[in-house]
């Protein structure tokens, strides 16, 4: 087995574990805040999403892309920022990681199998959200997340240089090193987005988080609205950053 193959396997496995850790954290927060009837349930979940996202990115970015979100990975593939085969491998690993997170949560839950899955499965708001509300909410939330992920990590700005290493644009300045701040920025984005879908979709903006409890419960209500909104929003957010909002360098 070649060194490159081993690195690919490690990276793919790392993406699965990253998805597992993130998924287990979010599902646990959803379950715990629901069962204890916390008045600050959404705050608990939002903080968990944000802080766990920061920790997972910092912990796994040396061995994998640390997307733990198929919408980000697919957008990276479609904008040619990630190889097709490797990207598909990451997406499969992400889904497996989230499914394993659900499986790990079940023996930890004090309530039954079905009740646990009903709690952690994304559902429209009780205020009367329909499929159209869900679709547009997930579309915009995922587009924002993917744009931030692209701007800070997937496709950050790199000024053009000549053969001597000098900037082509004489007005160019040394770019900001985002390697340290990118996980913080993405994690904070995950956190505030978790509060924005309360009136409609609940705010999932991650096909992996959405699909795992849906598969385990075999309950597919509103699934297409979540999935379509997340993947389409992710693609639009990534494409916008690559083609329109990537800083011009002359």
Curated annotation (Swiss-Prot):
It is a multi-pass membrane protein. Pfam families: MIP. A motif (NPG) lies at residues 206-208. The keyword Cytoplasm does not apply. It is found in: Cell membrane. GO terms for cellular component: plasma membrane. A motif (NPA) lies at residues 69-71. GO terms for molecular function: water channel activity. Gene3D superfamilies: Glycerol uptake facilitator protein. Residues 1-15, 64-86, 155-179, 246-250 are cytoplasmic. InterPro entries: Aquaporin-like, Aquaporin_transptr, MIP, MIP_CS. Disulfide bonds: none annotated. Keywords: Cell membrane, Membrane, Repeat, Transmembrane, Transmembrane helix, Transport. Residues 37-42, 108-133, 201-224 are extracellular. The chain crosses the membrane at residues 16-36, 43-63, 87-107, 134-154, 180-200, 225-245. Aquaporins contain two tandem repeats each containing three membrane-spanning domains and a pore-forming loop with the signature motif Asn-Pro-Ala (NPA). In microsporidia, the second signature motif differs slightly and is Asn-Pro-Gly (NPG). Belongs to the MIP/aquaporin (TC 1.A.8) family. Water channel required to facilitate the transport of water across membranes. Involved in osmotolerance. This is Aquaporin.
């Amino acid at each position: 087995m070649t060194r490159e193959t081993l690195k690919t396997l490690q990276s793919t496995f790392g993406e699965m574990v990253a998805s597992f850790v993130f998924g287990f954290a979010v599902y646990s927060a959803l379950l715990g805040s629901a069962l204890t009837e916390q008045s600050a349930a959404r705050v608990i979940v939002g903080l968990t999403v944000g802080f766990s996202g920061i920790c997972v990115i910092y912990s796994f970015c040396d061995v994998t892309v640390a997307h733990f979100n198929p919408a980000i990975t697919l957008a990276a593939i479609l904008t040619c920022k990630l190889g097709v085969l490797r990207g598909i491998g990451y997406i499969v690993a992400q889904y497996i990681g989230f499914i394993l997170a659900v499986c790990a949560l079940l023996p930890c839950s004090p309530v039954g199998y079905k009740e646990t899955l009903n709690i952690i499965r994304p559902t429209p708001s009780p205020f009367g959200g329909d499929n159209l509300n869900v679709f547009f909410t997930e579309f915009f939330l995922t587009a924002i997340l993917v744009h931030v992920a692209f701007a800070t990590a997937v496709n950050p700005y790199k000024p053009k240089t000549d053969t001597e290493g000098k900037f082509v644009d004489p007005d160019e300045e040394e770019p900001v090193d985002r390697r340290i701040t990118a996980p913080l920025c993405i994690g904070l984005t995950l956190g505030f987005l978790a509060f924005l879908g309360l009136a409609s979709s609940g705010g999932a903006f991650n096909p992996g988080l959405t699909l795992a409890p849906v598969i385990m419960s075999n309950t597919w209500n509103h699934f297409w609205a979540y999935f379509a909104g997340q993947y389409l929003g992710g693609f639009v957010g990534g494409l916008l950053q690559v083609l329109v909002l990537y800083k011009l360098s002359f």
